[in-house]
Each structure stands twice: as structure tokens, then as C-alpha cells.
């Protein structure tokens, strides 16, 4: 994958009548997979013996949860957290263009989940964190010794100077836009777009006004 702005729809486009998955290859110990589903397609319910996170990216559809087959819609920009051993299938709306989402499997037994997250209830990520005057706000959603998923809100005039991270990461713009500096080049990142940082890649974030983002970091 090139280190340039992208959308998950570009990395894993929807194909009519097909369900397709593609690994993001952030790290073997934290499987991150992009799924695209054609309109009206479905994935048979299954369960994992660990916590699973789902991030809506594009289109419309729902997750089918539990033995009672409860239908839970997931919209772009929303997070759905499922406890271990939760039976889960997916169904793309038949009257739409399809559905694209990200799956993150937390294989580690020891991790910390923010108690503002309610399992089985979709939550808009950008609504979980507020802007703080003249400041950069951080909100850890979940972290373990080999990963972190965090939200950040930048007030106007703030930003991150060039630095390096100890693992591969994907930044996703949730609101506003920013200039991403990466290894000496600048890229504009708009809401709904993502950017990959490789381990130890030199990067910076310069918001163009107020800006919210998520960051998924995998350390191996």
C-alpha cells in the first residue's frame, strides 16, 4: 500500500453480488480486515473467542447478532463492539449500493476498553470526543500492549509536530481536514479518508481548522 490518502472503498471496492475481504496487513497479532459486500449479499453468522470491533466505512447494512438474530444497523463513521462468543453475521441492504466496513480482532486477553463504549450498540466515533479550547484532546477507545485505538480532536491552531510511531498505523479523518506530513511530503486528508504510517515513518498532523481523527496503531 502506498503512503498516500485513500478510502477503504478504493482499497476494497464493492462488486455486485459478491462479498470480499482484504487484510490491511498492519500486523499478524491484531488482524485488521476490510470487507465489501454487494447490495443484498450476506455473511453467515459466526463467532470469535475474543472481542471484535467493527467500523462502518461506506454504504448501508446491518449486523445480525445472537441466536435471536437481532438486526443492528451500522452507518459510516460508527463503531460496534462485540463481546467474545457473540454470534454475528452481516447483511447489506438490498436497496443500496452495498456495504463496506473494517473488522478488528483483539486476540490479546489483557486489554483495556473505555467504559463509555457499550457492547452491541453502534456509536458515532466523532461524537465521543469534544473539542477543547486551544488544545488537543485524546480519548483511548481500547488499548493493549500490542495495539491502541484512539480518538483525537484538534482545536484550531493546534497540531502534531513531526514524530515517529513504534508500529504500523492507520489514521482516519472523522471531521474537518488536515495536512499530513509523511517522510518529507505533504498530503491533504479530508473526512472519510485514511492514511497509513509505517513503523518509524516520520509524520506530522496540521489541521486546517478544527479536526477530529481516529488512530489505529499496531505494535509488533
Predicted regions and their residues:
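Ordered, small/hydrophobic-rich secondary-structure cores
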Residues: 1-89
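A short, N-terminal "cap"/entry segment at the start of jelly-roll beta-barrel domains
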Residues: 1-31, 75-76, 80, 94-146
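Short strand-coil-strand connectors
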Residues: 28, 66-68, 181-185, 208
Amino acid at each position: 500500500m502506498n503512503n498516500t490518502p485513500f478510502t477503504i472503498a478504493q482499497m476494497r471496492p464493492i462488486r455486485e453480488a459478491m462479498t470480499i475481504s482484504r487484510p490491511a496487513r498492519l500486523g499478524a497479532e491484531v488482524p485488521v480486515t476490510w470487507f465489501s459486500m454487494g447490495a443484498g449479499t450476506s455473511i453467515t453468522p459466526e463467532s470469535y473467542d475474543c472481542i471484535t470491533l467493527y467500523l462502518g466505512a461506506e454504504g448501508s447494512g446491518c449486523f445480525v447478532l445472537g441466536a435471536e438474530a437481532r438486526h443492528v444497523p451500522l452507518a459510516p463513521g460508527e463503531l460496534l463492539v462485540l463481546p467474545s462468543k457473540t454470534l454475528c453475521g452481516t447483511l447489506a441492504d438490498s436497496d443500496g449500493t452495498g456495504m463496506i466496513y473494517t473488522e478488528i480482532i483483539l486476540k490479546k486477553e489483557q486489554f483495556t476498553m473505555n467504559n463509555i463504549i457499550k457492547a452491541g450498540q453502534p456509536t458515532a466515533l466523532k461524537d465521543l470526543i469534544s473539542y477543547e479550547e486551544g488544545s488537543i484532546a485524546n480519548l483511548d477507545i481500547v488499548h493493549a500492549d500490542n495495539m491502541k485505538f484512539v480518538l483525537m480532536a484538534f482545536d484550531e491552531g493546534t497540531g502534531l509536530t513531526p514524530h515517529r510511531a513504534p508500529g504500523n498505523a492507520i489514521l482516519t479523518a472523522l471531521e474537518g481536514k488536515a495536512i499530513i506530513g509523511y517522510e518529507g511530503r505533504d498530503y491533504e486528508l479530508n473526512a472519510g479518508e485514511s492514511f497509513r504510517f509505517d513503523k518509524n515513518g516520520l509524520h506530522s498532523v496540521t489541521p486546517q481548522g478544527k479536526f477530529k481523527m481516529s488512530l489505529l496503531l499496531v505494535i509488533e
